């Protein structure tokens, strides 16, 4: 599958009648059968109050009404963190090529606030192709302890092991929070298909809309046949 085709697919999401035909309450069931690295969660996420690169306060509640895609990384990580950031940028590119652009927020949270200062946070996005229009890199707020974001990551299910050279070993997980502020899913590792996360985001964007009119074959079924 070419990247051009993926972008074209993303551009068609939530457009016209497509918006009315999504898996609805079966979204998790469908994605679970389609994507082996998907995990349905459906519970309240850990609340947080952090700071962006400019020192502005940011809470998860600020994004109520949007789908939030968040993950934990740190700038000096030599291996999986940059790959994870690249994957998030790829997914963001597909989302932002569609009408969903204003309905999804991407968040990276540093687990190493002692070393990831404002300049580091500002420089990270452009290097990995992350678009600041709906992405931000968060760190601890003034007065918070250095382990605040690590404890937050642990509340999201991560475990940390420190090796020589202050290298942090932790799992690679992409967390998804729906428009009502519920933690809906995890996509584990880097082997999941990016288009599956885009389709899942689209399902959450369209959730709780009016019931669809009957049709011979739903758009989701047609997409499943393509992959």
Residue ranges and their predicted role:
Residues 25-61, 86-87:
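N-terminal "domain-start" segment that seeds a small globular fold
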Residues 83-151:
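Structural microenvironment flanking redox-active thiols in thiol-disulfide oxidoreductases
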Residues 65, 75, 109-114, 140-142, ...:
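Solvent-exposed coil/turn segments that connect beta secondary-structure elements
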Residues 4-13:
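Sec-dependent N-terminal signal peptides
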Residues 59-84, 88, 106-108:
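Short active-site neighborhood of thiol/selenol oxidoreductases, capturing the structured segment around
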């Amino acid at each position: 599958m070419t990247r051009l085709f993926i972008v074209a697919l993303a551009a068609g999401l939530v457009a016209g009648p497509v918006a009315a035909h999504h898996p609805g309450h079966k979204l998790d069931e469908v994605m679970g059968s389609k994507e082996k690295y998907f995990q349905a969660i459906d519970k309240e996420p850990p609340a947080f109050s952090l700071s962006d690169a400019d020192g502005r306060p940011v809470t998860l509640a600020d994004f109520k009404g949007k789908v939030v895609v968040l993950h934990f990384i740190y700038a000096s990580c030599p291996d999986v963190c940059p790959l994870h950031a690249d994957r998030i940028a790829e997914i963001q590119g597909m989302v932002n090529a569609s009408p969903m652009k204003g309905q999804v927020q991407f968040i990276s949270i540093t687990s190493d606030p002692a070393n990831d200062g404002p300049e580091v946070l500002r420089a990270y996005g452009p290097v990995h192709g992350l678009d600041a229009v709906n992405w931000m890199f968060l760190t601890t707020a003034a007065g918070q302890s250095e382990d605040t974001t690590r404890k937050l990551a642990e509340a999201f299910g991560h475990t940390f092991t420190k090796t020589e050279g202050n290298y942090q070993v932790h799992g690679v997980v992409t967390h998804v929070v729906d428009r009502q502020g519920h933690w809906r899913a995890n996509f584990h590792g880097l082997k999941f298909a990016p288009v599956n996360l885009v389709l899942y985001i689209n399902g959450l964007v369209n959730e709780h809309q009016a019931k669809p009119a009957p049709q011979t074959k739903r758009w989701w079924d047609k997409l499943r046949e393509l992959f």
